[in-house]
């Protein structure tokens, strides 16, 4: 029987297989990258060079957030605790623990511990940490119940829509100044968050920007 198709058509099935394979790999790679916690961030909990439990330090020992994150009230960016901060206690407490080897090495060499960053806003987004903390926004609102975390993860998406939810209705999040760093605070019986928030919103004249220029400068 005569061959009605040219010889080059013999390669079509192989080409189809290759194209499908490449597209499949691209889709699989895209899903793996863009939909993993490291990219979407919520739930992202990387392994750190030193295991650090906020549950032990905050809940059991009663340490205030500001002891380690000492610049949160005055700086635009919250600081990662220095090795000196850690060693203020750990030269005496659990001074030989294997878990703290990286801290002791940093103390000895002067090189910082290579902590893995968890919360990271894009460079095109402006955020001032001190402004929020000094106007009634608690650590809890952005970072979740860190006091209950044996290992820190990202609790909130910190996306534009998430930011705007607060900027459009800050009364749903503002709390008394004395309770900013109290991770267990809840409104007292007979009070509600919105009424408390409205009081501070009016007193502090809180009017967060909701236009592009407010956060993209």
What are these regions (language model features)?
Residues 15-32:
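Hydrophobic membrane-insertion alpha-helices, especially the h-region
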Residues 45-100, 128-217:
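Sequence context surrounding c-type heme c attachment/ligation sites in exported
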Residues 28-46:
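Aromatic-capped interface at the extracytoplasmic side
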Residues 115-133:
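Short, solvent-exposed interaction modules
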Residues 1-10:
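N-terminal Lys/Arg-rich, disordered targeting/topogenic segments
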Residues 101-121:
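Carboxylate-rich helix-loop segments that flank metal/cofactor sites and access channels
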């Amino acid at each position: 029987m005569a061959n009605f198709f040219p010889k080059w058509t013999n390669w079509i099935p192989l080409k189809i297989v290759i194209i499908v394979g490449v597209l499949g790999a691209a889709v699989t790679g895209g899903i793996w990258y863009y939909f993993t916690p490291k990219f979407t961030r919520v739930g992202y909990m990387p392994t750190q060079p030193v295991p650090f439990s906020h549950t032990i330090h905050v809940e059991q020992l009663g340490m205030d957030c500001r002891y380690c994150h000492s610049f949160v009230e005055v700086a635009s960016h919250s600081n990662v605790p220095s090795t000196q901060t850690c060693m203020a206690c750990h030269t005496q407490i659990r001074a030989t623990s294997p878990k703290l080897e990286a801290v002791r090495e940093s103390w000895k060499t002067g090189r910082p511990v290579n902590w893995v960053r968890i919360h990271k806003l894009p460079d095109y987004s402006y955020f001032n940490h001190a402004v929020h903390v000094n106007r009634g926004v608690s650590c809890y609102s952005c970072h979740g119940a860190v006091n209950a975390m044996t290992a820190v993860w990202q609790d909130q998406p910190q996306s534009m829509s998430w930011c705007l939810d607060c900027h459009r209705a800050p009364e749903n999040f503002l709390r008394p100044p004395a309770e900013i760093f109290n991770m267990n605070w809840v409104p007292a019986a007979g009070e509600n968050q919105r009424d408390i928030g409205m009081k501070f919103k009016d007193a502090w004249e809180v009017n967060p920007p909701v236009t592009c220029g407010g956060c993209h400068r």
